[in-house]
């Protein structure tokens, strides 16, 4: 009989980490019959799945570990583990800085967690495995278990882009594409469990080149076509994309696959070609605009979100103004924007940077004000329209109100029977609020 253990997992960072955290619990459950707990003080195993994109995210890890240190003193059998990209980047240094940590594991070694725990218990020595094994983790992970009507499916790992500011190629490793048939099988399993919306994940997801059993290679567009044919799957998203691989095949899929959500997240990072060159993004603003124009010729009302970095080394006011101009021209929806964070070991970390932090903060505020204005206008334009909502559950503020999301990721709250949870519903939008919409069930 397997020993039951309570597991607490804290997830920082991107959707890929959310996916990995779910798989951590599944692989532990297969060996230890685990149950999740929301209270780390009640756990037998505490894991933190980390992000290293920005310095503040990295410091969050050690802040959390500091909170858990005291529990370890009163419970010697407690297992504390650090996974994710900070684990890959720091490795043994985590143990040196926090000796009470038992496990340090990378994104590619999740499947080894049970064995690492057993080795720790046997040897009483901290275990570190941040390797990039040739046999990918997907081969050893158990069948996914759906939690609701939406699910993430990882189709590739790693990145070969080596943008000058980014640590992902160093922490996630080179690109590894999951076999085409394996992805379809996972999507079919999830559909049988009631999943209706799939989000395909990868650090550079639209560069997916999955090996097929017939010896050919499938790109993301072909994969999307096949997933759309699976009974029960009614909405498909993908993230995160790179403009260079946003291909004509993928653009054409928006014309032929109605299940493909009418929303695209396509990180451009900046609006100045000079800055893009220094970022090693390998495309121009004109090339980006041309792809957006082709997409909008097919889906005129598609909403587009992005990622932006403000204050990159050498950024001038003229460069920044070009970024604002791009945001206005494309009419970007809700987006992620940050002040550049120097990451050790990346080429950009060595670039001279003499822009005062106050200037960077001012630019970030101006950018975010513009993005928020765009988003509010888009939300107000939705009032009076009928939207197809995937009902996630009840509102955080009122258990009698249902809540779900539109294709363009707007949260909509409306009255309805709880039997609609996990289903699609048509809702007329009646009011636009700063962070959500209100509607009426049709």
From Swiss-Prot:
[4Fe-4S] cluster 1 binds at residues 14, 51, 85. Residues 145-378 form the Radical SAM core domain. Its EC number is 2.8.4.3. Its main location: cytoplasm. One of its GO terms (cellular component) is cytosol. Residues 5-122 form the MTTase N-terminal domain. Residues 380-442 form the TRAM domain. Pfam families: Radical_SAM (PF04055), TRAM (PF01938), UPF0004 (PF00919). It is an enzyme of class 2 (transferase). It is found in: Cytoplasm. GO terms for molecular function: 4 iron, 4 sulfur cluster binding; metal ion binding; N6-isopentenyladenosine methylthiotransferase activity. This is tRNA-2-methylthio-N(6)-dimethylallyladenosine synthase. It comes from Francisella tularensis subsp. holarctica (strain LVS).
């Amino acid at each position: 009989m397997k020993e039951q253990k309570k597991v607490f997992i804290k997830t920082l960072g991107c959707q890929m980490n959310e996916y990995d955290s779910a798989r951590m619990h599944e692989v532990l459950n297969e060996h230890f019959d685990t149950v999740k707990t929301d209270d780390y003080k009640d756990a037998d195993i505490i894991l933190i799945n980390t992000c290293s994109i920005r310095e503040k995210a990295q410091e969050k890890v050690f802040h959390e570990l500091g909170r858990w240190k005291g529990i370890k003193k009163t419970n010697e059998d407690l297992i504390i583990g650090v996974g994710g990209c900070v684990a890959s980047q720091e490795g043994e240094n985590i143990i040196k800085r926090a000796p009470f940590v038992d496990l340090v594991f990378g994104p590619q070694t999740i499947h080894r967690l049970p064995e690492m725990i057993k080795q720790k218990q046997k040897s009483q020595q901290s275990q570190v495995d941040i390797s990039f094994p040739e046999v990918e983790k997907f081969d050893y992970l158990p069948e996914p278990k759906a939690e609701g009507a939406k699910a993430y499916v990882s189709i590739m790992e790693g990145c070969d882009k080596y943008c000058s500011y980014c640590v992902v190629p160093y922490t996630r490793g080179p690109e590894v594409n999951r076999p085409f048939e394996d992805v379809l099988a996972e999507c079919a399993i999830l559909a049988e469990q009631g999943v209706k919306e799939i989000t395909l994940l990868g650090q550079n997801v639209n560069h997916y080149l999955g090996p097929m059993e017939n010896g050919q290679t499938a790109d993301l567009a072909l994969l999307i076509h096949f997933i759309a044919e699976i009974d029960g799957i009614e909405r498909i998203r993908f993230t995160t994309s790179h403009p260079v691989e946003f291909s004509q095949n993928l653009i054409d899929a928006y014309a032929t696959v109605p299940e493909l959500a009418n929303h695209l997240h396509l990180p451009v990072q900046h609006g100045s070609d000079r800055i893009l060159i220094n970022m090693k993004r390998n495309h121009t603003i004109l090339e980006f605009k041309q792809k957006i124009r082709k997409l909008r010729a097919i889906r005129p009302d598609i909403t587009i979100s992005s990622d932006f970095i403000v204050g990159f080394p050498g950024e001038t006011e003229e460069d920044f103004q070009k970024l604002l101009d791009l945001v206005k021209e494309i009419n970007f929806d809700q987006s992620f924007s940050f002040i550049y964070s120097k990451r050790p070991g990346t080429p950009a970390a060595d670039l001279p940077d003499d822009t005062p932090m106050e200037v960077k903060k001012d630019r970030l505020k101006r950018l975010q004000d513009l993005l928020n204005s765009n988003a509010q206008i888009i939300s107000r334009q939705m009032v009076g329209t009928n939207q197809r909502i995937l009902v996630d559950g009840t509102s955080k503020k009122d258990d009698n109100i249902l809540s779900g999301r539109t294709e363009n990721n707007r949260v909509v709250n409306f009255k309805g029977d709880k039997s609609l949870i996990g289903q699609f519903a048509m809702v007329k939008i009646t009011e636009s609020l700063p962070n959500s919409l209100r509607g009426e069930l049709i």
